[in-house]
């Protein structure tokens, strides 16, 4: 389906809440002018495999694409500002490039994405949110930046393929069970005297000083 903005109205143009939830839609191509993807707009669309978002999209609401398990990839627009809770939870995404324009992301963003293999956190994101990657059983590589300050509760819970992560000195908060259920050989690489080292010692997590 091609969604066209023909109104000529420069105010917020949206895909309304629950518009296509649980439908059999296979493709969603939005033309320029749309700014808002609503709550549950495309959630549980099991056949949805292609989504094209225009540069004009600024906000993706909670659960907008949740459980779209045929969705293997998506390109996020360069003017995007916020991504809501569980927006891509349970999708088939293998990776996700978050634009530098984004200043807020919600909890559970990519939870239950079992095909997710690699993620790089851009330096505009200061915090890995609660359960952001929970039960991403295929996740093998995570790249964190030197400005990151927090890792939320259960952020990597159940990431059974993740065997190491490098935590920068900038991180001053790590939530409960952040790394529970990772690979049996999982090890944190961190600096001597860092918060990450203290967290690992307290929670009996293997670590290596670098």
What is the predicted function of each stretch?
Residues 16-19, 38-41, 61-64, 84-87, ...:
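Consensus positions within tandem repeat domains that build extended binding/scaffold surfaces
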Residues 202-204:
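Short, structured coil segments at secondary-structure junctions
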Residues 1-14, 23-36, 46-59, 69-82, ...:
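Structural signature of tandem-repeat unit edges
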């Amino acid at each position: 389906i091609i969604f066209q903005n023909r109104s000529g109205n420069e105010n917020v143009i949206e895909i309304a809440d629950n518009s296509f939830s649980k439908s059999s839609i296979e493709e969603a191509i939005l033309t320029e002018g749309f700014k808002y993807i609503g709550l549950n707009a495309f959630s549980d669309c099991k056949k949805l495999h292609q989504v094209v978002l225009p540069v004009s999209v600024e906000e993706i609401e909670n659960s907008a694409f949740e459980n779209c398990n045929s969705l293997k990839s998506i390109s996020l627009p360069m003017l995007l500002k916020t991504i809501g809770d569980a927006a891509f939870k349970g999708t088939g995404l293998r990776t996700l490039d978050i634009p530098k324009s984004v200043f807020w992301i919600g909890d559970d963003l990519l939870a239950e994405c079992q095909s997710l293999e690699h993620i790089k956190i851009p330096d505009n994101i200061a915090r890995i949110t609660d359960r952001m990657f929970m039960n991403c059983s295929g996740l093998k590589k995570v790249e964190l930046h030197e400005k990151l300050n927090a890792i939320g509760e259960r952020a990597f819970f159940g990431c059974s393929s993740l065997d190491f992560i490098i935590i920068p000195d900038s991180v001053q908060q790590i939530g409960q069970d952040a790394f529970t259920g990772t690979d049996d050989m999982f090890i944190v690489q961190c600096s001597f005297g860092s918060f990450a080292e203290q967290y690992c010692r307290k929670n009996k997590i293997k670590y290596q000083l670098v």
